[in-house]
Amino acid sequence: PLYNIQSDRVEDAFILDVDMALVEETIRAPGGVEGDRSPNFYIVNYNADNSLTAFRFANSDISIESAENSFSEDNQNFNAGSFIIKVDDNEELSDRIKDAASEYGFTAYGVDSRPDVATHSVETPRVAIMHTWTSTQTEGWIRLGLDQYGVPYDYISVHDVRDNDDLRDSYDLILFGAASRAVVDDPLGIIHGLQGDKPMPWQASEFTPNLGRQDSTDDMRGGLGIEGVANIKEFVEAGGVFVTFSSSSSLPTHFGMAQGVNIRTTPKLWAPGGVFRTQITDSGSPITYGYGEELGVYF
């Protein structure tokens, strides 16, 4: 199943006779505080729920540690990635945690002592979404998701990246949305971008008042360029994280930023909309925190 949710298949028609009520509003998960009433620490189990992302960014001033392994505390089991929050490190934490747990639908467990597990700090990264000037609609889904969960970000073009030789000074994470499918076969399309003899503006004018609201330029011609590739490579080597989606993954694989990784095309498999069962092979990666051994993925 998607969203890391356990579901049960019921094949008996009796289920149709059970009393039901129409869901007319957004379903909100219940949340609250349990455990020690005067705790020294709060623990929030991490289950890869996006609401915890929203909580973290909305409370960026709270000092939070993340468990690097699963553990047990006071007869409760917690996944790797679970938040550990020390009361003394945060002012008025008890009231804030109580309100946040109710708003974001999680349970905070109060405990007396710090769990015996390795941790690292949970920071709020400085995020940028990089777009080309040839295809901007697909990465709009990324912007929508970040907007919904209150994650601030800069919206930058491949030209901005090409002209900035110190991306690490501004960002911790750069997301590159899906480009056109043709890019998988020819990643140089990202490098060259649009071509033409005359400037191609994308900006508001008397005749195009609705253009350029998210980003604008005097000239869309040209792409990331080799300079941009070098800037991204330096960004990653300096500790930045560069995440690509779908077809744009041809960029790091083609230019050696993801050595040992190749894109495998499946011309006989084309099943958009399908949900497939996958297995997680690296449970120690922070990317897989909160998930079980299997995961449903959307094609």
What is the predicted function of each stretch?
Residues 1-299:
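Intrinsic-disorder/low-complexity accessory segments
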